């Protein structure tokens, strides 16, 4: 396999390729396993990491673009905040020494406590890292999210200090479970491959269970309850998800139907879009359920707060029927909980009490 041997020098000559990680949904990374415990992790943009097992030598004449990390991997700089939950569930938070959020920005206890105790250090946000700190404390790798593509000079500067970086592309995954499957990438990176499989399979099981209990007649589209997922921007527009985004797919897996279809989508590359209030009104007034997304503005505590933000919502069917929900503030940091979120949506649609929900609550 010529592609697999590309640039690997002696790894390929001396190390025998064994197998590749089986991926069910994720499309934006791969992991190859070699004899002797060596691994090659590759992301969507072609960046490669070679992990070298403890006590083993780094192969000679390896391509200079390949990032080499010796196990046990440590001193990571985690800028991609959505991934901390994966490290937390993998029991791998101790591999992270630097954070792109300070303690008050985290809903994840282990991260917040590590920063409060000084074991983890705040090293600045993605666009303004504390280079001096990262260099003096021997940062091994920066894990960025796709925002870094807007600040290429940061990646260049990190590189000039011999700090390699990778971008995690879980947000590019169209399937909700494809996002969760990135836990296997970080499981491979931190040598917790089996644990990662376990965590991923647990979320898959939840989704499969919902599909079974749902008994949804997928052919009969008219049966599905419709759901709008939105938030009100500071200038009074309504931000919604495009029909191709992962949130509409979660709604569908939960047995519902997203209220907007492809005919409403704009043609930007983004997963969200802003609508004029009038268009949202016309499109969602008859939605069976409304979910207010709290991730941007901290959300609302009750129905009156929501109606203060947007009085015309009082005309909406979901408001009249008492079917308005809000996401909890920590939802966007809980990347390993997509299965639970789908479960909550399913509970909402089937009329189960909201007391059992983890990431949604009813606005009263």
Give a label for each model feature.
Residues 75-78, 96-99, 141-145, 165-168, ...:
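Structural recognition of the beta-strand scaffold that forms the well-ordered cores
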Residues 210-301:
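Flexible, glycine-rich surface segments
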Residues 70, 77, 124-129, 145-152, ...:
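Soluble non-cytosolic domains of exported or imported proteins
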Residues 42-135, 141-148:
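A short, structured surface patch at a secondary-structure boundary
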Residues 74, 82-87, 92, 99-110, ...:
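Extracytoplasmic ligand-binding site segments that recognize negatively charged/polar headgroups
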Residues 1-12:
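Single conserved hydrophobic/aromatic residue that forms the stacking wall/gate
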